[in-house]
Amino acid sequence: MKYIIIGGVAGGATAAARLRRVDEKSDILLFEKGKYISYANCGLPYYIGGVIAEREKLLVQTPTFFGQRFRVDVRVENEVIAIHPKDKTITVRTADGREYEETYDKLLLSPGATPVRPPLEGIDSEGIFTLRNVEDTDHIKSYLTENSVKRSVVVGAGFIGLEMAENLHHAGVAVSVVEMGNQVMAPIDFSMAAPVHQHLIQKGVSLYLEEGVTHFQRTEQGITVFLKSGKTIPADMVLLSIGVRPATALAKQAGLKIGEAGGIWVNEYLETSAKDIYAVGDAIEYPHPLTGEPWLNYLANPANRQGRIVADNMVFGNKVAYEGAIGTSIAKVFDMTVASTGLAAKRLKQWEMEYQSSVTHSSSHAGYYPDALPLTLKLTFHPVTGKLYGAQGIGYEGVDKRIDQIAGLIKRGGTVYDLMETEHTYAPPFSSAKDPIAIAGYVASNIISGAMPVVTWRELVQHKNEVMLIDTRTAEEFSFGTIPGAINIPLDDLRERMLEVPTDKPIVLFCAVGLRGYLAQRILMGNGYKNVRNLSGGYKLYSAAVAPVPVPSIAAASVDARVTFGSTETSGTVVQSDSILSAGGSSKEPLKINACGLQCPGPIMQVKKAMDTLEPGEQVEIVATDAGFARDASAWCDTTGNRLVGSHEDKGRYTVVIEKGNSNMVCPSSTGTVAAGRGKTLILFSDDLDKALATFVLANGAAATGQKVTIFFTFWGLNVIKKLHKPETEKDIFGKMFGMMLPSSSKKLKLSKMSMGGIGGKMMRYIMNKKGIDSLESLRQQALENGVEFIACQMSMDVM
């Protein structure tokens, strides 16, 4: 028997080795038009960036060694230019142009895929590259070295594009990424890509989304990249990572069937439409196990599995069926890990498949064990049966093992209930007693059962004006930022403030990550509320999804863009610069606090406690893993008169340095925040509803800027703070008369104008509730939580 294999690397080389292991006597010929038959193509970007220092480590097997070990006739720089299925022959062209023919009994096609290179003006200019093989790698590496490249543009934000962006950055080159879509990494959903956008920008990458390249121009100064918006980006080098397409030219020449998706058609045994000709790898298409539709899957793992299967079928006959691939992939994007498996929500929409999704925020391991890092999982599943369709994960540690575990369940037709029953190894350094995938299963099962109806961030954006939006976080968290239109009823206050929640309007609850929103939802549903939904993924997901991507400036596209807020980045290590430590009025070392593993508002509460122990001018340095901490710290400084000295992120850890202000220091913020130490006193002597509302709005606004606020209630103003359920007290005849004539509580206050016997006040409250405006009672509670001091006039109380 004589086997011929066209193409090496994952599919072809794997098949050749397996063929020899199961058939010692047959002839095996391996043809490769390049110089290399087996190399780590997924490691190429890391060699360019210097992470992999030795080029030889990329070469898994040299042609000579492979040929000797497996007794395979390896012919590199021999390109097969034609296949003749009827004659069972191939035509080969050598590097020097000579052509010859070889016969075969069975043939395997493993030609791979070719990079997309659109016919744009200037695309063939010097300094514009694609990355697909070792030869491409050598060209890019030498160009970087010989031309002292300082600026680069990566066109395309897929896996290879972002890996190249990271490695060029690692090599000291400033990077701009241009992507035609509205997100990076097309296999994942937009909401999961949004945190990746933020991470790239934090690392100094200039990100151009929804931008296309129109043409390139080479000048003496370098390459100018022209965008469809009219913007231009100067560069010394351009890397095209627009995508790949199946290499089907040889198959078409041979008359083989090309499938609907554009790849070589194969049956379940990986045999093409021509007898005794098989195909594997990036060039083939195959039905997706979940949709049944043909698709192209450009991943190394399926190609290796196909290589083993096809070798057995070529030797023993068509007995081993290929079950297909669901598309399980992972990428390192600077410090972040991004992984996915199965079908994302947007793919399910594309195939018009009914689905539901869940988003959960967990930690890489037990939160109380040091250095627990955030880990977010998104599941897609059937809304009735719970059958798993897909999963996506982003985080810094432990993402891979969770997605791998879920992928195995999907391949076996598993459901969200299987996630709940999955056993996992547990010790605090590695996981939690309830693993993130178990938590994801619990949440998904609650959605299916109706225990937790959810609304997605996108649905909320579309219908926000039709619902009452309640933020169940603490008042302090609420003050750092919330969804526009939301009112704040902290979870622990909900039972006492339930009268503020209308029964005739759709309610959407949310918190930071979803748990408190769910608990609030159960309280309301347990008290008869029907139309109550929890925001999937919480404010953390919503704020990331709706946050605009900053428009890059050309000036920002420099190596110095990596240095932010006085920190210096060197080979992935962040070193605190002297400028941060000496910028304040104190020479003392900052008080250091480790808040890693704490969720909001934990880190900011730690800051507040620390600041209470410091003198003006002294600093606190706090490290947290909550991704929103740096934003919250900035808002906290703006409202308290303290100074944000600097912040930076490294491997999922956010370090913030804050200097305590004093009465003589004004926070140098563009918001014009007044320094802490100044105070306001408001006197409320009216019990008119509108005047009381105005008083509390002013009080809360002043308190939010860090000022000490006091409200002095006198005469009729005392009615504003009357308790709804008052204790029994002894009163004389005049006290009882006042009690009957005056409002019994703040709920009974009237308007100063157009009261209409109390109807005006009720109308005002109805309109406020409908528009999601805080009630008087809500504003009063917020004032107490913000530290506003209430003083009741003793004389007035004695008289009344």
Residue spans for each PLM region:
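Beta1-alpha1 glycine-rich phosphate/pyrophosphate-binding loop at the start
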Residues: M1-D73, V116, A165-I188, A325-T328, ...
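N-terminal Rossmann-like dinucleotide/flavin-binding domain of flavoprotein oxidoreductases
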Residues: R18-Y104, D189-S206, A344-R347, I439, ...
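Rossmann-like dinucleotide-binding cores of NAD(P)H-dependent redox enzymes
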Residues: L59, R151-S152, F159-Q217, N297-A303, ...
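A Rossmann-like FAD-binding core segment of flavoenzymes
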Residues: R75-T94, E102, H169-V266, F565-T568
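Glycine-rich dinucleotide-binding loop and its adjacent helix/turn
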Residues: L109-A171, S206, E260, V266-E268, ...
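FAD-site-proximal beta/loop scaffold in flavoenzymes
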Residues: D124-S148, E220, T224-F226, K231-D312, ...
